[in-house]
């Protein structure tokens, strides 16, 4: 990795003459008093690395020469050179020389162009434009105070994506323009297509004109033929109908007699049916009563079955428990039997071993025969002497054995009692476990029930609140809709207004906090009546844009020009000169200051409002406005409520209609608010409807709570039963057994005391008997070499006693195991009996359930049968009722027939008369039709006769009442009857029409068709003979427009591709930098804070195009909660800013990093952390050159460069260097104290 080795300065700023500064170590600190020239050294490094003059704290390049600022330049040139060193490569020198008013760049003493110079530096990782190698004084605080938008600008500068911003905007404009051109050509093409369609229609109309004339003639013939054909058909039909009616009159008389006979028969049938219906109703009542009696029996049987099923479930549960007990007891007994067999086996093995040992010992202890005889003789003699004592001892032995047996019995009973107590303890433990489980289940169930109840309450409250809120929202929505309806404002923004709104949003986004908005959007008249007056006074300033400064305004104007927007008026608050408000005007009667009737937000736009309103006064009417304006010794600017304005100059202006239109813009603001409220209420209504739909969930929760409550009730009952019955009984029995066990102790102790007392007496008797034996066996004992005869006997019987003792132990073990085995057998038998008993109970309950189910089914079957019978009877009743109704209906019909028989006769006679009249009318109609055809010159196709045979006289006139007139009419009809018309040209469909309505419809259709054709013919003017030429012209024009549209579409596509390409390049540059910084910043912040709990994270406001909006930067200081950056302390802000600086530096890092007083705002703790971090990084990542005034910081450096001033015409900086690597750090780790 390369590093900055030396800096050579000549006549640069405060450095007079030539000075070589260095060498620079990996971590070098520059120190010195204020004003000594430390920052000038940093400026020198910046200068040689190509920094702009404006960032070097001078106005012109010449001002960088020593003494130039005071008018005494030390020379006409100055330069700074830098020696850059890399491992394994030659040192390179970069120099920048001030010659006259320009810079000259050199690499290794060779003059190069600026771009070559920059490229070489970029190869080393030094980016001049991004300034990734230095941090100026105050830059840390500046970064800490940056807002998200300024942070984005910083990233744009670092990533160099900002270089593409101008191209990005240009491509975007080209894309938008190309899309607009495409849309324009599309609409143009659409209009020409409409013209082409119109030309086609003109040609088609000319072709149709002649065809329509021919159609009219054919339609006239068809209509007349249709009328005549159906007239003749109707005449023929009427003749047949007349003959038919005469026959019907004869038949009607015979039908009347038959109807009377039928009526009598129907009356008899109806009487029979009604009697049957009454019988069925009686049977239905009986079955209904029977069913009401059977239902309770079925319900009772069902309840018995349900109850028995529950008992069966409980019995099965008990059976399972007893079976578990039985299996456990059986296992215990098997273990005891195994133990018994083991003891018996051990006893047998012992007996066999003793037998073998006794045989071997018997051979060793055998006396001589004479000695044996002597022993037996002496033994007999001793027995005789101690006979009394032996009898007394025998009596003691008998008593002792009896007491020992009694002691063994008591101890056996004690063991049995202890076993029973253990059994009861097991049962009590089982009861307690069951109680614990039940209590645990009850507790859990209660908690669950409480949760369910709570949930039910919450859901109920939520649903009820939702219902109430829905009603409220609907009322509010209705009110809003009414208000919107009353407003009757249909605002459709023009593209011009939309464009202005877009530009307004853009400059607000570009200059957040500096652009406040349009004046009309920031203020509102206090009352509606003032709207017109305020509108008049504000005038063109209504749409003026308020900004904080003149610079912001000029920047906005430049932006609008670039966007080709319309001219806008800006009111910069720092530039406006406003006269103070005349307080005396507030005392005038009948007038108010216009500024006093306007509400505005934010408060600091008041200056702009004062500028727009001045000292203008608003009055209620024109007279007051004129009086106050011109009536006093001093003129005032006044306005009436109707908008009449009186200027001080005497000019009076109105324009009420135009003002009202402008004033409506105040109302439009209210309408916008109403629309926003409507949208908000609609969204809330959707949310509340979702909550209301939780009713189904509420019902489910209620059902679950009910089920849980029932199970809890049963569990509590079971718990109570277990506590009060099973546990209490077992505790009582255990207490009784413990009482019995307590009585065994005293009895056993009493027996033991008696046995011990008797043993002492027996011991005294034995001692007396021993004295007798010693006297008798004295000589014999000397002979065999023992002290006394007992020693001989004990030696012989000792073995037997040990064997007897061992045998007794085996016997006791067998006795104990036998007792336990007998007890377990008894308990096992009890368990087996209980299992058997529960099996019998289960079997019995199952049999009873089977019987009860059969009984239930039997009752159900009876009910089903009864219900089926009842339903059958009801069906019969309905059928019979229907039959009776039908019969009544039939009788009613017969009565109607009979009652109307005479009327029918009269009716038939009337019909005959009517038919004759119709026949006469049809003949008259035929005559009129033929006469009309002759008069209208409609050529009818005739097969017999000619058009001349048609009479010109009127036929069937109402005035003709004489016999001669009738005869003449009949003669005309007879002559015209000879004319036969050829209906071959008449369509068959028209001939087939039969019904009068159908004939009328067809006739109307033909007439309508004829009328339409005639109407169309009348409307159509003479055909356009140039229609074809026009069509050809329009087709050519359409093709031309289509080509233009296609070309515009391709241009739009190309423009979009170009825009997307530059957008992608800009995004890639920005995102590469952002992702690198965002990835590293948390780790760097942790390292700076020396605490892994510290957190730092970056987030773009616009992830799609992050360079268009701000970047949020947040830190969580160690041991603290999350707080916004503004709420962090000064030191925390500085550490956060340093983390961001180092993270930015990690993206395309420069080999060295020059930092000017970054520790200014840090306390000692944070200084140590930052210094240690820089020291760590300088060893492997970058060379650090830091200007610092704080000892805690620069003592961590590897070398020091001291800058001190010498006074002259201006300050002269001198430099000292000091290598700290020779002096090891006494405390390398600041955390180790």
Swiss-Prot record:
Chain sites annotated for binding ATP: 32-39
GO molecular function, one term: ATP hydrolysis activity
Modified residues (N6-acetyllysine): 648, 713, 1037
Keyword Hydrolase recorded: no
Low complexity composition bias: residue spans: 953-967
Cellular localization per UniProt: Nucleus; Chromosome
Coiled-coil boundaries: 104-124, 163-503, 660-935, 991-1068
GO cellular component, as recorded: cohesin complex; kinetochore; lateral element; meiotic cohesin complex; mitotic cohesin complex; mitotic spindle pole; nuclear matrix; nucleoplasm
Entry PTM: Phosphorylated upon ionizing radiation or DNA methylation. Phosphorylation of Ser-957 and Ser-966 activates it and is required for S-phase checkpoint activation.
Gene3D superfamilies given in the database record: 1.20.1060.20, 3.30.70.1620, P-loop containing nucleotide triphosphate hydrolases (3.40.50.300)
Region (Disordered) location: 284-307, 350-369, 946-969
Biased amino acid composition, Basic and acidic residues: 284-293
Subunit composition and interactions: Forms a heterodimer with SMC3 in cohesin complexes. Cohesin complexes are composed of the SMC1 (SMC1A or meiosis-specific SMC1B) and SMC3 heterodimer attached via their SMC hinge domain, RAD21 which link them, and one STAG protein (STAG1, STAG2 or meiosis-specific STAG3), which interacts with RAD21. In germ cell cohesin complexes, SMC1A is mutually exclusive with SMC1B. Found in a complex with CDCA5, SMC3 and RAD21, PDS5A/SCC-112 and PDS5B/APRIN. Interacts with STAG3, NDC80, BRAC1, BRAT1 and RPGR. Found in a complex containing POLE and SMC3.
The family this protein is said to belong to: Belongs to the SMC family. SMC1 subfamily.
Domain statement: The flexible SMC hinge domain, which separates the large intramolecular coiled coil regions, allows the heterotypic interaction with the corresponding domain of SMC3, forming a V-shaped heterodimer. The two heads of the heterodimer are then connected by different ends of the cleavable RAD21 protein, forming a ring structure.
Protein name, per record: Structural maintenance of chromosomes protein 1A
């Amino acid at each position: 990795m390369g590093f900055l080795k030396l800096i050579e300065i000549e006549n640069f700023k405060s450095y007079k003459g030539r000075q070589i500064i260095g060498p620079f170590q990996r971590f070098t600190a520059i120190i010195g008093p204020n004003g000594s020239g430390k920052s000038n050294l940093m400026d020198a490094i910046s200068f040689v690395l190509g920094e702009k003059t404006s960032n070097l704290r001078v106005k012109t390049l010449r001002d960088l020469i020593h003494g130039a600022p005071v008018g005494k330049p030390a020379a006409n040139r100055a330069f700074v050179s830098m020696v850059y060193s890399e491992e394994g490569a030659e040192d390179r020198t970069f120099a920048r020389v001030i010659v006259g008013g320009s810079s000259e760049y050199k690499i290794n003493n060779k003059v190069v162009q600026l771009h070559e110079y920059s490229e070489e530096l970029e190869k080393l990782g030094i980016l001049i434009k991004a300034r990734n190698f230095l941090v100026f004084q105050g830059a840390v605080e500046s970064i800490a105070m940056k807002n998200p938008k300024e942070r984005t600008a910083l990233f744009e500068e670092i990533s160099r994506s900002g270089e593409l911003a101008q191209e990005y905007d240009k491509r975007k404009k080209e894309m938008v323009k190309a899309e607009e051109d495409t849309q324009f050509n599309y609409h143009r093409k659409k209009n020409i297509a409409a013209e082409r369609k119109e030309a086609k229609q003109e040609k088609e109309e000319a072709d149709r004109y002649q065809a329509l004339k021919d159609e009219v003639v054919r339609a006239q013939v068809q209509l007349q033929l249709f009328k005549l054909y159906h007239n003749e058909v109707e005449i023929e039909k009427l003749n047949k109908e007349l003959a038919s009616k005469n026959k019907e009159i004869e038949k009607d008389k015979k039908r009347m007699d038959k109807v009377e006979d039928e009526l009598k028969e129907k009356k008899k049938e109806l009487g029979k049916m009604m009697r049957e219906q009454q019988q069925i109703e009686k049977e239905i009542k009986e079955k209904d009563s029977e069913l009401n009696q059977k239902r309770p029996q079925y319900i009772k049987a069902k309840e018995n079955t349900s109850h028995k099923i529950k008992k069966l479930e409980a019995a099965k549960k008990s059976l399972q428990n007893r079976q578990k007990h039985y299996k456990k007891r059986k296992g215990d007994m098997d273990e005891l039997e195994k133990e018994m067999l083991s003891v018996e086996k051990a006893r047998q093995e012992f007996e066999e071993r003793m037998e073998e040992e006794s045989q071997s010992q018997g051979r060793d202890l055998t006396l001589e025969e004479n000695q044996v005889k002597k022993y037996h003789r002496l033994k007999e003699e001793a027995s005789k002497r101690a006979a009394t004592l032996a009898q007394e001892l025998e009596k003691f032995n008998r008593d002792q054995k009896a007491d020992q047996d009694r002691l063994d019995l008591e101890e056996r009973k004690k063991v049995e009692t202890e076993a029973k107590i253990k059994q009861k303890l097991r049962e009590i433990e089982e009861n307690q476990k069951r109680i614990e489980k039940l209590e645990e289940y009850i507790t859990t169930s209660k908690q669950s029930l409480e949760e369910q109840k709570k949930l039910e309450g919450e859901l109920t409250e939520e649903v009820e609140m939702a219902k109430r809120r829905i009603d409220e929202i609907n009322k509010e929505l209705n009110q809003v809709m009414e208000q919107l309806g009353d407003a009757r404002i249909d605002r459709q923004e023009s593209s011009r207004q939309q464009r202005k709104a877009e530009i307004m949003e853009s400059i607000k986004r570009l200059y957040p906090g500096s652009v406040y908005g349009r004046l009309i959007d920031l203020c509102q008249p206090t009352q509606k009546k003032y709207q017109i007056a305020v509108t008049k006074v504000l005038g063109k300033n209504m749409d003026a844009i308020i900004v904080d400064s003149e610079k912001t305004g000029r920047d906005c104007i430049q932006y609008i020009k670039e966007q080709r927007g319309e001219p806008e008026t800006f009111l910069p608050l720092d530039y406006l000169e406003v006269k103070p408000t005349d307080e005396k005007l507030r005392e005038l009667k009948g007038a108010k200051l216009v500024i006093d009737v306007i509400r505005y937000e934010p408060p600091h736009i008041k200056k702009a409002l004062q500028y727009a309103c001045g000292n203008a006064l608003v009055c209620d009417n024109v007279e007051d406005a004129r009086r106050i304006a011109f009536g006093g010794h001093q003129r005032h600017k006044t306005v009436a409520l109707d908008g009449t304005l009186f200027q001080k100059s005497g000019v009076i202006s109105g324009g009420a209609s135009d003002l009202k239109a402008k004033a409506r813009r105040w109302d439009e603001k209210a309408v916008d608010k109403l629309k926003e409220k409507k949208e908000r209420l609609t969204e809330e209504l959707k949310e509340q409807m979702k909550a209301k739909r939780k009713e189904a969930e509420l019902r489910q929760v209620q059902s679950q709570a009910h089920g849980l409550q029932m199970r809890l009730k049963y569990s509590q009952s079971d718990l109570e039963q277990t506590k009060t019955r099973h546990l209490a009984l077992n505790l009582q029995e255990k207490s009784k057994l413990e009482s019995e066990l307590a009585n065994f102790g005293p009895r056993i102790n009493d027996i033991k005391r008696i046995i011990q007392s008797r043993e002492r007496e027996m011991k005294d008797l034995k001692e007396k008997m021993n004295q007798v034996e010693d006297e008798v066996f004295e000589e014999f004992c000397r002979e065999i070499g023992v002290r006394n005869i007992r020693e001989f006997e004990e030696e012989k019987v000792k073995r037997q006693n040990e064997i007897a003792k061992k045998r007794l132990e085996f016997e006791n073990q067998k006795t104990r195991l036998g007792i336990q085995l007998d007890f377990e057998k008894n308990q096992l038998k009890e368990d087996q009996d209980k299992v058997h008993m529960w099996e019998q109970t289960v079997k019995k309950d199952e049999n009873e359930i089977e019987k009860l189910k059969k009984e239930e089914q039997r009752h159900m079957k009876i009910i089903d049968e009864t219900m089926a019978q009842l339903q059958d009877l009801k069906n019969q009743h309905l059928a019979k009722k229907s039959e009776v109704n039908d019969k009544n209906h039939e009788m009613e019909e017969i009565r109607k027939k009979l009652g109307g028989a005479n009327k029918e006769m009269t009716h038939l006679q009337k019909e005959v008369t009517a038919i004759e009249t119709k026949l006469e009318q049809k003949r008259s109609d035929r005559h009129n039709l033929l006469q009309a055809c002759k008069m209208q010159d409609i050529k009818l196709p005739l097969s017999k006769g000619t058009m001349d045979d048609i009479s010109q006289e009127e036929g069937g006139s109402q005035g003709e009442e004489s016999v001669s007139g009738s005869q003449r009419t009949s003669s005309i009809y007879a002559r015209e009857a000879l004319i036969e018309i050829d209906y071959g040209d008449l369509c068959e469909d028209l001939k087939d029409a039969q019904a009068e309505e159908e004939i009328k419809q067809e006739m109307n259709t033909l007439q309508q068709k004829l009328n339409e054709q005639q109407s169309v013919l009348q409307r159509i003017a003479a055909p356009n003979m140039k229609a074809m030429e026009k069509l050809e012209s329009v087709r050519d024009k359409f093709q031309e427009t289509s080509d233009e549209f296609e070309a515009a579409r391709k241009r739009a596509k190309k423009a979009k591709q170009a825009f997307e390409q530059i957008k992608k390049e800009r995004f890639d540059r920005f995102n590469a930098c952002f992702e690198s910084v965002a990835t590293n910043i948390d780790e760097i912040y942790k390292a700076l804070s020396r605490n892994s709990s510290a957190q730092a994270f970056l987030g773009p406001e616009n992830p799609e195009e992050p360079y268009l909006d701000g970047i949020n930067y947040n830190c969580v200081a160690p041991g603290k909660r999350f707080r916004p950056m503004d709420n962090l302390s000064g030191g925390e802000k500085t550490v956060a800013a340093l983390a961001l600086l180092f993270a930015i530096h990690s993206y395309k890092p420069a080999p060295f990093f020059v930092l000017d007083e970054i520790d200014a705002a840090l306390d000692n703790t944070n200084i140590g952390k930052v210094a240690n971090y820089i020291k760590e990084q300088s060893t492997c990542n970058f060379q650090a050159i830091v200007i610092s005034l704080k000892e805690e910081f620069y003592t961590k450096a590897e070398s020091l460069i001291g800058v001190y001033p010498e006074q002259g015409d201006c300050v002269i900086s001198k430099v000292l260097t000091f290598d700290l690597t020779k002096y090891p750090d006494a405390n390398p780790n600041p955390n180790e104290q």
